[in-house]
Amino acid sequence: MGRRPRGPGSPRGPGPPRPGPGLPPLLLVLALAAHGGCAAPAPRAEDLSLGVEWLSRFGYLPPADPASGQLQTQEELSKAITAMQQFGGLETTGILDEATLALMKTPRCSLPDLPPGAQSRRKRQTPPPTKWSKRNLSWRVRTFPRDSPLGRDTVRALMYYALKVWSDITPLNFHEVAGNAADIQIDFSKADHNDGYPFDGPGGTVAHAFFPGDHHTAGDTHFDDDEPWTFRSSDAHGMDLFAVAVHEFGHAIGLSHVAAPSSIMQPYYQGPVGDPLRYGLPYEDRVRVWQLYGVRESVSPTAQLDTPEPEEPPLLPEPPNNRSSTPPQKDVPHRCTAHFDAVAQIRGEAFFFKGKYFWRLTRDRHLVSLQPAQMHRFWRGLPLHLDSVDAVYERTSDHKIVFFKGDRYWVFKDNNVEEGYPRPVSDFSLPPGGIDAVFSWAHNDRTYFFKDQLYWRYDDHTRRMDPGYPAQGPLWRGVPSMLDDAMRWSDGASYFFRGQEYWKVLDGELEAAPGYPQSTARDWLVCGEPLADAEDVGPGPQGRSGAQDGLAVCSCTSDAHRLALPSLLLLTPLLWGL
């Protein structure tokens, strides 16, 4: 995979496919050897048997059957080999030469290259593609590799980013969930795992995924647990999990194999594709997935494919000793009952901070996880003894992130602290004692600091406090003067938080919108009524909630139709280049 896995949605590893109950060996040898004639040395009987089994497995010959197998002709076999060579970018000789046999032994996806029945049609017609009828899809890693240097958090992070490759350019949204109701179930299995596509040990086929549809396996993606899965490894014998996963998830959303050598959907594994945080699909794959689902609003089909990269691109961190990142339950604040220390929009996503933890929402207001992530492990450079923050915001002047605690502040580029911090808040001409909230108002591109009933207005571009401040609040009618948090959001509105409620102020307005305050927990943190179609996971403290596989689970809903999610991957950082 790495470029093109096969099969029911999965790439395969190195090694030849096993011979199956195909054509009678003697007839195979006679048919294929006769085709070689004097032009080339006759292939070995073993290669002939494996070759025909391979051609049948991947769609170039009808399924092997002793009754019909005897009717195979030299011409049909030659055509099948020629089609395979064309698809694989080889010279079309029509015989099992060394290059053809070598390609057959290349690690690849389990799915066939040609649709069922294509061999019997005079004009090969691709059946209509299958696709998901909904745009919000859930996923879950149900089983993990047993003997792998990759920890669970790394595996989940790689799955997240492999799916993100497809959702970045289409209207599809992927959400990790706990429980058995996920649309895309991900497993690491060995040998026969009861889906009709048994794995074959190290090498051979390495993974597969099932196309969308009404069947119970639709979207499910399986990886061979006997493969040496790697990530950012110099080991040439390893199988890059991210590259294979991108290919397989292409199948899971409806894409079949293609012959284009640069496509990720080519069936053969071609090695790593690069950093998950920066990888972009080849143009051929973009066009094909756009034909299925259309283009995401934020993406232009004619946009330049190579987008500028940040000077210091973020890295996917390695897991600490492969331990679970789920914090001890006694330390975790509950998102549905807590009021928050700070709320901020960062790179278009919302962050809710409480104690040493934070929750994160995507641009579409989908909660990434029901469990919080640990602040110190994500924002590298915050003091380990820091037990909370007072306020956080992203500067509009340079898009750096500023954290406030007491009379000190820290500046981060992406998730790494800048040198020379912390510094005193007096740099902002603020009095000692800290602030309660901060946000940048889109209406005038000014930053507002709040403390008790006072507020200050600051120009981030000139790094100066505007004259005449502090002023007595509130500035916006209907919004309380003493705030816990404030945030500018991607819809252009500003949001103000106090206790467990929030107020919305439309861009340019000076009073709260009608109907506010509303519940922060319900509208932002997925603490409403259970989803009508959600799996009942049993009673719990907040609606229908409980625990599964050691993870907190909650089936809740909001006006954004959010899905239940398990604990956040601490190794799934933001893609800061958004």
Swiss-Prot record:
Motif Cysteine switch mapped to chain: 107-114
Membrane association type: Lipid-anchor; GPI-anchor
Molecular function terms, GO-annotated: metalloendopeptidase activity; zinc ion binding
Active site: 248
Leading EC class: hydrolase
Gene3D superfamilies registered for this protein in UniProt: Collagenase (Catalytic Domain) (3.40.390.10), Hemopexin-like domain (2.110.10.10)
Region (Disordered): 1-22, 107-133, 301-334
Residues holding Zn(2+): 109, 247, 251, 257
Stated role: Endopeptidase that degrades various components of the extracellular matrix, such as fibrin. May be involved in the activation of membrane-bound precursors of growth factors or inflammatory mediators, such as tumor necrosis factor-alpha. May also be involved in tumoral process. Not obvious if able to proteolytically activate progelatinase A. Does not hydrolyze collagen types I, II, III, IV and V, gelatin, fibronectin, laminin, decorin nor alpha1-antitrypsin.
Homology family: Belongs to the peptidase M10A family.
Comment block on domains: The conserved cysteine present in the cysteine-switch motif binds the catalytic zinc ion, thus inhibiting the enzyme. The dissociation of the cysteine from the zinc ion upon the activation-peptide release activates the enzyme.
The name this protein goes by in its record: Matrix metalloproteinase-17
Gene (name only): Mmp17
